[in-house]
Amino acid sequence: MTFPRAALSDLIGDFIVYRGLEPADQRLGGWSEFAARRGLPARSIPRKSEEAYAEVALAILAQAQSLRGCHGPLAQLLYLGDTRLLDGQAFLHMQERSGWPGYAFLASENLQAPAQSDREGSLWLANRWAILADFVAANPGNERTVVVVDLDKTTMGARGRNDRPLDNARAE
């Protein structure tokens, strides 16, 4: 089966926020604007697991929701990632700061074990990305639901499946 070439923007538009917390869509403010308003050094970009990261990310999400012209502010958070520690912490900080209900789906492929998922509160931990379909079915959203997708290498090389060649290429 052959698929045509596509870009991430075909799936999610320009509402992409880069690692430095700067959105692709220039209508959205990012870290540099946030830091300037607070008198913080622009070079001190918070890490994903820090509360300040969640604060900036939530501000960007609120701006994006406003640009979409939806009725009402965001009210639910769904998060997709591949690491229990970093993505799980980022989600929990975002959920705590926003007060929104939500769930995170965190998958790390392990093809040697039978497919399974476990729940730890609002975290779904899975060893197969295929289990994502169950997560989506159990957590329907609406126009006030934001879905945060940690794209790092997850979209190109799922942890435990195709991540080694990407790690090797980064090291070269």
Predicted regions and their residues:
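HAD-like aspartate-dependent phosphatase fold
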Residues: 1-172
